[in-house]
Design a protein with these regions (language model features):
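Non-catalytic alpha-helical scaffolds and adjoining flexible linkers that form interface surfaces
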Residues: 1-167
Length: 167
């Protein structure tokens, strides 16, 4: 009924009580936790939030608990709603990929272990950064500023992104 209309809204985060009859599930009760209403009136926030939802839809398997990734998604939606939507999205993707086993090594040179201070190269097959002295064949040079932001995002939890200054 209309008392549950919020449950069908885009980005609704709620606790649902379902009943099942003849292999069909029906929402009997729903308690809204957050509607993330702030993402709806801004196209950039809306698209960033849509990427989070699509990531969850594509990469979190039904019936397989992914508490860390789900919690990161909720925090990212809050960050997208209240903070910088693109930083919140990028931080979510980096953290969620890491949680699902596809993390990137961004804190030091993968080959020599030294801190990267100037030119930086990213190798996509190994998902790692390399310094100029150790760059493997096929690695792509990226801007140091890009590397710095990605490295900072990887070191922060998604919950802390909306309060961060990565400039």
């Amino acid at each position: 009924g209309s008392k549950l209309s919020f449950a069908g809204e885009v980005f609704c985060f709620a606790e649902y009580l379902l009943s099942e009859k003849n292999d069909r599930r029906t929402v009997k009760e729903a308690n809204e936790i957050d509607g993330f209403y702030g993402v709806r009136g801004d196209i950039v926030r809306f698209y960033a939030a849509s990427v989070v939802a699509e990531f969850i839809r594509l990469f979190v398997m039904p019936g397989v608990p992914q508490y860390v990734t789900f919690s990161a998604a909720v925090s990212a939606l809050k960050g997208i709603e209240q903070g910088d939507p693109l930083l919140s999205l990028a931080g979510f993707l980096i953290n969620a990929l890491d949680d699902l086993g596809f993390g990137m090594e961004l804190s030091y040179c993968k080959a020599c272990g030294e801190e990267i201070k100037e030119r930086v190269f990213f190798d996509f097959p190994s998902s790692a950064a390399y310094c100029f002295s150790c760059v493997p064949a096929g690695a792509t040079e990226i801007r140091f500023s890009t590397f710095s932001v990605l490295s900072a995002l990887a070191s922060l939890s998604v919950e802390n992104l909306k309060n961060s200054d990565l400039s």
